[in-house]
Amino acid sequence: MAFIPRTLTEDNLELVTQVNHFANFLLTNLLVDLLAAAGKSRVVMVSSLAHGWVQNGLNYEDVTWEKSQYSMTAAYGNSKLANILFAKEFGRRHQERGIRSYSVHPGTVLTELGRDIRNKLPVFLVPVTDYLSSLFLMTPKGGAQTILHCAVEPGLSQETGLYYANCQVKTPSKAAQSSEEARKLWQFSSDIVGDISPLKIR
């Protein structure tokens, strides 16, 4: 989810952050025992190059944008940075249980992600932007390749917590490389999710 006006959920969380990060955090932790029991499991977090839009790390004091001017791009970038940090810390915590995790930039893919922006364009610009998008953006099939690579490539079985793009390990932004930041996000997310679900996070 991306590029929508600031919206609060019934849990009083900002919608983009809840859908893109907190929901993933909750679901993955609900499944963790099943993943461990299955053996040699993998979790792939779909992040984005947009994580690099966040220069100074996550702002834990204002995740709902109550105190600052809401930015659609920053909210999306924050959630994608959180995906990388979550994959990093999840991998560290669960590698001994046989679970591997990866974060992925799938590429700039022609999807409905920017539909809210498209719907606000002048009518005469819509066919122009649609045409240009078809020329320069990846197809969904192309965008799925790095995700599938991380999910099934045998050569990755000993790796965990890494960031991939174009089916190769890439170096994410400085903020996304911090193990301390990954642990901080984990604890923060555990506290938030713990208020919503009785889940015991490990």
Model regions and ranges:
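Generic recognition of well-ordered alpha-helical segments
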Residues: 89, 146-149, 188
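Intracellular terminal tails of multi-pass secondary transporters
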Residues: 177-202
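A short, mixed-charge helix-start or loop-turn motif at secondary-structure junctions
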Residues: 10, 68, 72, 129-133, ...
